[in-house]
From Swiss-Prot:
It holds the Pfam family RAB3GAP2_C. Keywords: Cytoplasm, GTPase activation. GO terms for cellular component: autophagosome; plasma membrane; presynaptic membrane. This is Rab3 GTPase-activating protein regulatory subunit. It comes from Caenorhabditis elegans. One of its GO terms (biological process) is establishment of protein localization to endoplasmic reticulum membrane. Belongs to the Rab3-GAP regulatory subunit family. Probable regulatory subunit of a GTPase activating protein that has specificity for Rab3 subfamily. Rab3 proteins are involved in regulated exocytosis of neurotransmitters and hormones. Rab3 GTPase-activating complex specifically converts active Rab3-GTP to the inactive form Rab3-GDP. The lineage of its organism: Eukaryota, Metazoa, Ecdysozoa, Nematoda, Chromadorea. It is found in: Cytoplasm. The keyword Plastid does not apply. The Rab3 GTPase-activating complex is a heterodimer composed of rbg-1 and rbg-2.
Length: 1307
């Protein structure tokens, strides 16, 4: 098996021009020398531990068998490249920073800084600089590049610092622009071996390494010194030499207890040793000395490699360093005022500077010496500071665990190797990889540390390559705990930099973590197009068989067509790892073949199949006509789902498994759309060209769905289909149900039940007809089988009387009276077409018990909503339908004359139903439903539909002929709709005792107060209808049921599995006729209350009618059932109640209009009272309007008294004032004051009688004011009963005679 090649992303390159400039500046006269030859080290065959990998011999990458899938093709063996123009790069010292954004190249005493611009793929020269002085003593032996954090923001970069160590022990600090900031000498006798700026999670430090020891420079002190130097140089206050001689760099020289010379030093962070409690107080000074510490001390740990010890760990106590930091901080504070106040007053003092090379060494103990016989070449610390990778001269690469200080991995066969680390982050997880470049083998490898697995490997074209770390972008005194990804870069023979890109999932390649590896790849597959090259490549990288199976199945679910699925499976089989899929591809191809054939047979027939005019079964002609009409309407539906939308092959494979015994398609896991698509797929061939027997054997028998669920799916498909249904499809459906019934008994009963439960009447009619045809066919087949059995046996003929019950032919009720059922359901469908609202559409099983009532209800709703006037109702539903009902003749001829269609005109729809079931539409029955529908609409929205109650009280007494039906309808309306509202109005007016609150009563009433009077008037009309209906005690009515409906009801009982005598819901008319007769006197008692309430509300009186107008016994009778018989003293009440009634009528007469006084007179007659004020107020109102004729008649029936005389005198005075205005005369002052004072407000009320010329009262009334004065004087002259009351008439007679010559009494 092959290993995944290393992904090398092109990052940056050194252009030819830049390379020539750098080469010429650094190398000078040595620029044309031969390329740098790598030193060879001798190999040894030392014994290794059992976990070493034997990779010493040169092997090809393509034959490795670490992990992964086998791929074809092999990489060509790399050869040594020729001389390159950039091989000088490997002769120089190369350092990187911030993912190779900055490069530091040093040679002898010169250095060059290169930088990669963000938008360019090549390096640019930032500076070219050298160290002044003796070129031999200033030869650069060590270098380092790091960032300097900003003073105020530790996350911001201030500048790049270049640190250079020389042969004479100096360390110089430059900026990236080549400006020297500071230098210090750390040794006089030794060169600087290395400079390292180390950053770990627990801290950071700057290390200067020599042969026997190393300096640990405090980072705070280094930052302070560099910033002071930048400020002083920028202000030109001091030179670099003056700064370096005046400012001291705080450092500490550590002398570890080692044997050989130091090669490498790695800072491994701060640690607490796992020592016993008794050793906490031990001191290095002497055996008896004791150190008191509150807790375990912190130690700075270093890993050191020497010439005699492969790896040794150095421990340094942090206590002294902490004291050092305090001194640095104090020193920094003392320096700040020295630039200002101290210097201003001339009292500043320069601190005593201690040279770094003069510092005394501090002893540092060592622990855990590892492999003394080896000599290290290269070292590299992991990004998380847990591991250190070391190469030795024995061609080994060792990985050391810092925490346990042990070797955890050893790799063989990597002589002169370069090592580096790469870290990759995903969410909160970090993966680390070790990159190894073996130049002798031209091999680049990537290993995981945790699993010890080679995840990537690749041959490179030339050995003149290298791997370098990208350089951390950590800054001096910046944040240490923030993790960032670490990158490594591969430098090829052309000097181009390539970033080694490693996906995170490669870290999960251990055999115990293959499921996690596959999980990451599955995430990639979700975003990859199924069937593409990338998808197949990722699929081949999966490790576990379960992952392959899951991925294969999920990929199948995303496919659309069968051809695409076949191609996909063929491609999968070409992959070597497809054998782990087992039998999945075979079963999938089998299922896809079934799907493809089913889809192919779904196409409609062409040419050879002709539409048939009739069915293959003996259906009645009227049934065929009705079914043709509804089948045509069935295909005209546009609001249903698309029949062509079938399951895609992916969905088919996801939800349907042909190997299963049963699939519950009606479980919660299936959505409604998925069921519909499955139904379209299964029953598509039924509407296509597939032979029905072959269709049943190859589709319905093979699909793992129960027969009952198949029927449900067919119902879903048939219910929402838009396909045109013809007799061919009808016959095929019958044959399908025949086969289903043969295989499992009870299918037709299930279809029957579905038809009865359907709200779609055309669908139910077609299904019932299909079941009828299937049952007839089953009966015929059963009879043929019995005839064959009788022919096989010679049976003797017997007399019919001797036959047993089993020998008689059984009659199936379900197969009888299909014509009656279809005709009634056709009328139901016509009735539903009258309404646009579908809220009243019920199931057929709910309509069956009351077909006639349901049809009339729909007709009533149409009449109310249209609306239809009374004349149209009389025309559509005549009161005497004897001509239609008396028609005699052949029933078949009458059915042929019936028109079967769905007309647009609603009145024509009524006529179509009337010709089929005329008795359903008797006049009184229809009007009764109309009245009930009006009141129902009023009760739902009382305020908006208030006019319906008036229409009902108008239609009810005029149109319903039968008094018993009229009485029942009025009684039901009163009890259901009127009674509670009427009672609430009475309670609201009373407002006494523990009555309901005003808010509750208004809510019960449901309309505004302005409509209360009109409602009470309609209540009076309803009560009047009840009284008129019971005067003659009408007998119960007997409505005959339509024969067609009766036969259909008996057949429906069989379909509903009920007996023929099952309870049938009462019609509304029958329910109304059964209402008990009301008590005439109790109804009259309520009418008196309604009239009294209306008078009170119209006149605005503050009165309590129940407490004042009726006695206690009468109050108890209110709101009782109208058919009860309580004691009601209508006219025999106590005197107190009579007086209150009298006072009430007097107030109405005084404050009401003529209409209210007319109603008050009606109450007066009912209560047998004599109220003079009513007649007199009527007369007075007539005189005010100039109707003297009517006023005289009313005055004649009044009791004459002085009070009436005064009222008439005021009207007479008002007429005299109007007469003066008409004659343009002026009264004397005394007369004028007298008449005005006497007339008062009546002067503005009086007027002459005005009406049309056809009015007979025009000639009987005065036409001028003079005639009016004379007429009223004569009529009122006899009213006064005393001399005092007659004085105004005598005086006004003199005034009329004096001024106008008119008089009515001779003085």
């Amino acid at each position: 098996m092959s290993v995944t090649p290393v992904i090398l992303e092109a990052y940056c390159a050194v252009s030819d021009e830049v390379a020539k400039q750098v080469k010429k500046y650094l190398l000078g006269d040595f620029a044309e020398e031969s390329k740098f030859e790598r030193k060879n080290s001798e190999s040894s065959d030392g014994s290794e531990t059992q976990f070493c990998r034997a990779t010493e011999k040169k092997e090809n990458v393509e034959v490795w068998d670490d992990w992964g899938d086998k791929e074809e093709g092999a990489a060509e063996n790399s050869l040594e490249s020729d001389e390159s123009i950039r091989n000088w790069l490997f002769r120089c010292d190369l350092k990187t920073y911030s993912d190779a954004e900055y490069l530091l190249v040093t040679w002898e005493s010169r250095f060059v800084v290169l930088r990669k611009p963000p938008d360019e793929p090549v390096y640019k020269i930032v500076c070219k600089q050298y160290i002044e002085g003796d070129p031999i003593s200033n030869e650069i032996t060590a270098s380092s590049i790091f960032g300097l954090s900003n003073v105020r923001h530790i996350e911001l970069l201030d500048s790049i610092i270049i640190a250079l160590g020389t042969l004479d022990g100096h360390v110089y600090f430059f900026t990236e622009q080549g400006t020297m900031l500071y230098f210090d000498r750390f040794s006089i006798f030794e060169p600087v071996n290395s400079l390292q700026f180390e950053v770990v999670k627990t801290g950071q430090t700057f290390i200067v390494v020599f042969t026997k020891g190393f300096f640990m420079i405090n980072p705070i002190s280094l930052k302070s010194v560099l910033y002071q130097a930048k400020v002083l140089i920028a202000k030109c206050e001091k030179t670099v030499k003056q700064i370096s001689e005046s400012i001291e760099l705080q450092s500490e020289l550590l002398a570890p207890d080692i044997k050989g010379n130091i090669i490498h030093v790695i800072f491994t962070g701060l640690h607490k040793p796992s020592t016993l409690e008794q050793y906490i107080s031990a001191s290095y000074d002497s055996f008896y000395a004791k150190v008191e510490k509150p807790s375990l001390p912190l130690y700075s740990t270093f890993m050191v490699t020497t010439e005699k010890e492969f790896a040794v760990f150095v421990w340094h106590d942090r206590e002294e360093q902490d004291k050092l930091i305090d001194d640095v901080i104090k020193y920094g504070k003392s320096l700040v005022p020295s630039f200002g106040i101290r210097k201003f007053f001339g009292i500043s003092t320069e601190p005593a500077r201690i040279a770094s090379h003069m510092r005394s060494a501090v002893h540092a103990p060592t622990r855990s010496i590892i492999m003394e016989t080896r000599v290290a070449q290269n070292v590299s610390r992991s990004p998380d500071c847990q591991y250190v990778a070391v190469t030795d001269r024995m061609a080994r690469v060792l990985v050391i665990d810092i925490a346990s200080r042990q070797v955890v991995l050893i790799f063989k066969g990597y002589r002169d190797a370069s090592i580096s680390w790469v870290s990759v982050t995903e969410d909160d997880r970090v993966a680390q990889f070790l990159t190894i470049f073996a130049p002798r083998r031209s091999l680049l490898e990537v290993w995981t540390v945790l699993g010890n697995v080679r995840v990537c490997a690749q041959h490179v074209p030339s050995s003149e390559c290298n791997v370098v770390t990208g350089g951390e972008n950590k800054m001096l005194c910046g944040r240490c705990h923030v993790h960032t990804d670490s990158n490594s870069f591969f430098i090829d023979e052309k000097g181009e930099f390539h970033r080694i890109a490693l996906p995170f999932h490669l870290a999960l390649t251990s055999r115990s973590r293959q499921d996690q590896h596959d999980h990451l790849l599955l995430k990639q597959l979700e975003n990859t197009k199924t069937g593409g090259e990338d998808w197949f490549q990722t699929f081949s990288d999966l490790k576990m068989a379960t992952s392959r199976k899951t991925t294969f199945q999920n990929a199948l679910h995303n496919l659309s067509t069968a051809e695409e699925a076949h191609q996909f499976i063929a491609r999968i089989r070409s992959i070597p790892t497809s054998a782990s899929l087992g039998d999945l591809p075979n079963s999938a191809e089998k299922s896809i073949g079934f799907y493809a054939r089913t889809v192919a047979e779904t196409k409609p027939p062409v040419g050879e199949y002709d539409d048939k005019d009739t069915s293959n079964y003996k259906l009645d002609s009227i049934v065929e006509r009705i079914l043709e009409c509804h089948m045509q309407k069935f295909g005209e539906r546009t609001d249903m789902l698309n029949d062509s939308e079938v399951m895609k092959v992916g969905e088919w494979l996801k939800y349907v498994d042909l190997s299963q015994e049963d699939i519950d398609v009606f479980s919660e896991h299936w959505s409604e759309k998925q069921r519909h698509c499955l139904a379209n797929l299964i029953f598509g061939p039924l509407f296509g060209s597939f032979e029905i027997d072959e269709y049943y054997d190859t589709v319905l028998e093979k699909i793992p769905v129960k027969r009952k669920n198949i029927v449900k799916l067919f119902y879903m498909r048939f219910e929402k289909t838009t396909t045109h249904i013809d007799w061919r499809i009808f016959n095929r459906i019958v044959e399908m149900f025949l086969n289903l019934e043969k295989s499992e008994t009870g299918i037709l009963e299930q279809v029957d039940q579905m038809a009865m439960d359907s709200k779609d009447v055309p669908l139910g009619m077609i299904l019932l007809s299909i079941c009828w045809c299937a049952r007839i066919q089953i009966r015929i087949l059963k009879g043929n089988d019995e005839d064959e059995v009788e022919n096989d046996h010679d049976l003797e003929e017997e007399d019919e009387k001797n036959k047993t019950i089993d020998e008689w032919d059984a009659i199936s009720p379900e197969a009888e009276h299909l014509d009656c059922i279809i005709m009634c359901l056709h009328c139901v469908s016509l009735a539903q077409s009258l309404l646009k609202d579908d809220s009243n559409i019920l199931r057929i099983s709910d309509v069956v018990p009351r077909i006639d009532s349901y049809i009339r209800e729909n007709v009533a709703k149409w009449i109310v909503s249209t609306p239809i006037d009374t004349d149209t109702i009389e025309k559509l539903f005549p009161r005497d339908p004897s001509e239609n009902l008396a028609e005699k003749g052949n029933e078949e001829d009458r059915r042929k004359q019936m028109i079967i269609d769905f007309p647009d005109d609603k009145e024509v729809v009524i006529q179509r139903m009337y010709q089929i079931i005329p008795r359903v539409f008797e006049h009184d029955l229809v009007v009764a439903d109309v009245c009930w529908e009006m009141m129902s609409q009023w009760f739902r929205e009382k305020d908006d539909n208030f006019s319906y109650i008036k229409d009902c009280t108008t239609l009810l007494p005029q149109s319903i002929v039968d008094p018993r039906l009229r009485h029942g309808i009025a009684r039901l309306i009163w009890d259901k709709f009127i009674f509670m509202v009427f009672q609430s109005i009475v309670n609201m007016v009373e407002k006494t005792g523990r009555r309901p609150k005003d808010k509750e009563t208004r809510k019960e009433i449901g309309f505004g107060e302005v409509k209360l009077e009109e409602f009470l008037m309609e209540c009076e009309k309803f009560l009047e209808v009840l009284m008129d209906s019971v005067r003659d005690m009408p007998p119960p009515i007997d409505f005959k049921q339509d024969l067609l409906v009766e036969m259909a009801s008996s057949s429906f009982a069989a379909h509903l599995h009920q007996s023929k005598t099952a309870y049938r819901q009462d019609q509304f008319a029958i329910l109304a006729s059964r209402q008990p007769l009301v008590n005439f006197h109790l109804v009259l008692h309520h009418q008196h209350l309604a009239l009294a309430l209306r008078l009170q509300l119209t006149t605005g009186l503050r009165f309590h009618p129940l407490r004042n107008l009726f006695c206690v016994t009468g109050n108890r009778a209110f709101f009782a059932s109208l058919d009860s018989h309580p004691l009601i003293p209508l006219d025999r009440v106590d005197d107190a109640t009579m007086e209150k009634r009298h006072a009430f009528l007097v107030k109405v007469a005084e404050q009401g209009s003529m209409e209210e006084r007319r109603l008050a007179r009606h109450l007066e007659m009912e209560w047998k009272l004599t109220v003079n004020e009513i007649s007199f107020m009527q007369a007075l109102s007539s005189f005010r309007l100039g109707n003297d004729h009517q006023g005289s008649l009313e005055l004649a029936s009044c009791v004459r008294d002085d009070r009436s005389a005064v009222a008439l005198a005021r009207v007479l005075a008002a007429r005299l004032i109007q007469l003066a205005n008409e004659a343009n005369k002026r009264y004397s002052t005394a007369h004028s004051q007298y008449l005005c004072a006497l007339a008062g407000e009546e002067a503005a009320r009086v007027e002459l009688y005005e009406n049309s010329p056809d009015d007979p009262l025009v000639d009987s009334n005065p036409k001028t004011w003079k005639d009016a004065v004379t007429s009223l004087g004569r009529a009122g002259n006899s009213v006064p009963q005393s001399a005092q009351a007659a004085i105004p008439f005598v005086r006004m007679n003199d005034i009329a005679k004096l001024y106008f010559g008119a008089q009515w009494v001779n003085n």
